[in-house]
Amino acid sequence: MIASIVFFIVLVDGVATGSPNALVTDFDCRPGMKHCGVCQQLISGSTGANALCSYKGVGDFIVNNFSMGPVDWLWPSTAPSYAVVSESWGCVDDGAAFCDTTGNFRDHRGRVAREGRDGLGTVLIRPAGNGGPIDDCGADGFTQAIGTVVTTVTDYTRSERCAAVLVTVPPPNETVWYDGKCGFIPSSSSAAPPILGNMLLALIRAHPTLTLRMIQRILVRAAKPVTVTGWRGRGWWLNRVTDRWTHRNFGFGEVSPSRLEIEARRELSTSRAPVAWSTLDTCDLSEVEWVRVRLGIAPAVFRGGVTVEISSPSGTIIEILGKRPLDFSRDEFEGEFVTPFWGEPGRGKWTVSCTGGVILTTEGTCHGIR
């Protein structure tokens, strides 16, 4: 058995300090709040009374929780070295809200992703959302960051379309210990981040030198399409450039826990060029990993009728914002959108197109290997 360092956490005036293995954030993590409590149990694994239930996550990990306040909440200026932060909150899933995140909040979360865990990078995991076909997590700015791993439950019918989704996790048809008994894990996208977080905590414990970028690459290679999503025709397509299957709702597919260890060893034995970035109109990368665009848009009629697509020089077309029929706002808006283009060459013409509106401002970057 691999030994691990035990970390402790102290909350001082509502600010998290110290260095635990993981952190769960939710709108309300007071004692007795089931949503946050179940997420904390899922990421901590099968320990104590939880071992009596059918969920068998790897244990045991020290997990703290943090109640989110207003959107101007900031990470401490000296970011704690969390290995994983599981975030099961976000934009309201009503198909009408549009959340753009700017300023200090985005900057501090970005710094944690880059500098956490002594510079290796903290893994921030977010759910795609529960809005189903009436919503699109492209409108949830909290998911739109290159350092964030967005996930959902495979074949979850209320999962929002989202070009930012990297991978999915198996449906949680298991029970977890809560409120003095074993109860079924709620089937929602909120359950996906802590389930994936538990897998990644085990991976990091076995391979503590893995960086955030390495973990993202491992996840892509450890994922595969699954039959339950109808991968032989229902939305899955094969990228002939990268030879990878992808899906608008499910990213690169469902993570196989057994493949994580195999791909981790492969990644650690591979000499890889450092990450590079370029503006999208002059992208000179040999392998693009992520593309980020920030757009200002004026709707022709309603904001919910606006769709945005990005096409690569290789001809891959990805919808980064879909129709949201309950969003009747007529106001101009700004949004930031990210999507993975794992392994495609960046040289050539990138095109961002919009229907149902007019693009007023455009700024984009590509990130990957030069």
From Swiss-Prot:
Residues 240-370 form the P/Homo B domain. This is Subtilisin-like protease. Residues 18-261 form the Peptidase S8 domain. Gene3D superfamilies: Galactose-binding domain-like (2.60.120.260), Peptidase S8/S53 domain (3.40.50.200). It comes from Ictalurid herpesvirus 1 (strain Auburn) (IcHV-1). One of its GO terms (biological process) is protein processing. It holds the Pfam family P_proprotein. The keyword Glycoprotein does not apply. Transmembrane segments: none annotated.
